[in-house]
Amino acid sequence: MKKKPFYKVLYVQVIFAIIVGVILGHFYPSIATDMKPLGDGFIKLIKMVIGPIIFCTVVTGIAGMEDMKKVGRVGGKALLYFEIVSTFALLLGLAATHLLRPGVGFNIDPATLDGKAVASYAAKAHGQSTVDFLMHIIPNTMVDAFAQGEILQILLIALLFGSVLAHLGERGKVVTDFIDGLTRVLFGIVHIVTKLAPIGAFGAMAFTIGKYGVGSLVPLLKLIGTFYLTSVVFVLVVLGAIARFTGFSIIRFVSYIKEELLIVLGTSSSEAALPQLMEKLEKAGCSRSVVGLVVPTGYSFNLDGTNIYMTMAVLFIAQATNIELTWMQQLTLLAVAMLTSKGASGVTGAGFITLAATLAVVPTIPLSGMVLILGIDRFMSECRALTNIVGNGVATVVVSAWEKELDRNKLRQALKGGGEVAPTETTAGV
């Protein structure tokens, strides 16, 4: 097959668009800020199909399972993995901030901070208890879940729908076949929308640089650098070790999903690449049922980048305001962050709202301290989203391996960038 010219390759187009967006934002900020609708429009186009794709993928995956106990088993293994890896991410963020101390030297008086700028984030985060979170998973109506784009609500509906179809067997085959066909149509729509990724990335990046300016980064470069460095270490060391133990290279895996990562980089939203990621994981040998359960769940329960950010941001504010936290308070912070991070989604700004929820229950640190990082949060959200999507991709491969439903032949071919996939060779374990 003839190789595409480099300028027609999607990730090359996205890189070029991001560079042009940065240049426009720096030299013509007034024009660049008007480009925001391009980024917002692209994300809306992707979000338009996320709910239906998750529903169809999960339903067909579960309907094809002969053993319904498998649904609970896969879900249980996924949640166990999420909790273990999330704990590593929280601890790494804590350790890196203690080691590199990015907030030391600011000497900010908490009394001088104006909390009005972060009041809206605090209001959104206030009062979100565990019971509220669990009750929110149950939609008011099926239509409302899709209309609002609530991933966990759609996942609940899909689990029930798929379970009933599996129970019906041949009697439900017509419905199952219809949903399977609808899945193909939806992914076809995604392929069309993805071609617009360079335009979306250009608009989002131009707006970000145009509004905040490169100069706004300088005073807080140490925090940004610490966060990016810690996230890279997490991906290469923690996720790298998990990947190696499972039998694949984290570097090759990251290279395999580079187009999705560049879309995330341009839009700062890991949801923007969710449909493409699910399709890529299936092509890499993960079973549809595992992909359908693990990826959507991971977008609420496996946000590694957000976890690193949470502990790092809280400790940074404490260091900047010269507030000493005891080890008991830091352990409390870990426990609280473990819960509040589960309410975050893959949308820009969700990490900042989650931070407000964490600070609200750690009264030692003033909530108004969030203004210190409000201006740079947009620049950190890219790294959060990138780490989140890599973490969810690795989690899906690992759970597929645990379930003995990972086609290692397909995985090897995909990560090598090979063409034809050899006959199925299902894994015999991790």
UniProtKB/Swiss-Prot annotation:
Compartments (UniProt record): Cell inner membrane
Gene3D superfamilies reported for this sequence: Sodium:dicarboxylate symporter
TM ranges: 9-29, 45-65, 79-99, 149-169, 185-205, 223-243, 308-328, 356-376
Keyword Cell membrane included in the entry's annotation: yes
Any single Pfam family the record assigns to this protein: SDF
Main location: membrane
Transmembrane found in the keyword field: yes
Record keywords, A-Z: Cell inner membrane, Cell membrane, Membrane, Symport, Transmembrane, Transmembrane helix, Transport
UniProt feature coiled coil, ranges: none
Family note: Belongs to the dicarboxylate/amino acid:cation symporter (DAACS) (TC 2.A.23) family.
Function: Responsible for the transport of dicarboxylates such as succinate, fumarate, and malate from the periplasm across the membrane.
PANTHER family linked: AEROBIC C4-DICARBOXYLATE TRANSPORT PROTEIN, PROTON/GLUTAMATE-ASPARTATE SYMPORTER
Stated name of the protein: C4-dicarboxylate transport protein
Phylogenetic classification of the source organism: Bacteria, Pseudomonadati, Pseudomonadota, Betaproteobacteria, Burkholderiales
Gene giving rise to this polypeptide: dctA
